[in-house]
Amino acid sequence: MNIIEVKNLDLTIKKTQILRNVIINFEKGKIHGLIGRNGSGKTMLMKCICGFIRPTLGIITVDGKQVGKEVDFPKNMGIIIEAPGFIPYYSGYKNLRLLAGLRGKIGKAEIVQSMEQVGLDPTLKRHVRKYSLGMRQRLGLAQAIMENPDLLILDEPMNGLDKDGVSDMRKYLLSLKENGKTILICSHSSEDIEVLCDTVCEMDKGILTKIKG
């Protein structure tokens, strides 16, 4: 069963064609990878799937609902697109508490659990501005998972992590898959994609050039 279906997708911004007739399905319960150089269109495709950008042509359905028609932003989805933005003078926990308050249905236990699952100490008082890049990336993932979504959309989840951090993140993402989650990863690293993903989709100049798996 497909959780994401992309049909004949085109995206043109200021007379520049960003995506060209992209056709791809992503099966539920698997880890899928998008790989390509800067400017290949992979991040723009993810933003279209998330509902952040409306495509010029084509149809995207997520969990059976058409994005932009039946639903503006797909529900039950955790997202990290580019660098997560946090309030620099708040702790990681306080940032997540603020976001949880805006969403209105996430308790302290869910926040603590999401931070601990990605290797962050929820009692740490350090301001986010003093976090390493890797710690901010982990905090972004904690934000994405704190509502226990079925689908995760992750742009460069390994960015800023050291060797041990990358290994831990890979193990954690694989454990999410084992628990029935679907994950779509965008990465420059072919190694991360090859190790983690059941399917690998390569993009170049807005065109889907190769699909493996």
Name each model-derived stretch.
Residues 152-156:
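Catalytic Walker B motif of ABC-type/P-loop ATPase nucleotide-binding domains
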Residues 35-37:
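The feature captures the beta-strand-to-loop junction immediately N-terminal to the Walker
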Residues 97, 108-123:
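Conserved ABC ATPase "signature" region
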Residues 50:
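Helix-to-loop junction immediately C-terminal to a conserved catalytic motif
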Residues 58-73:
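Conserved ABC transporter NBD signature motif
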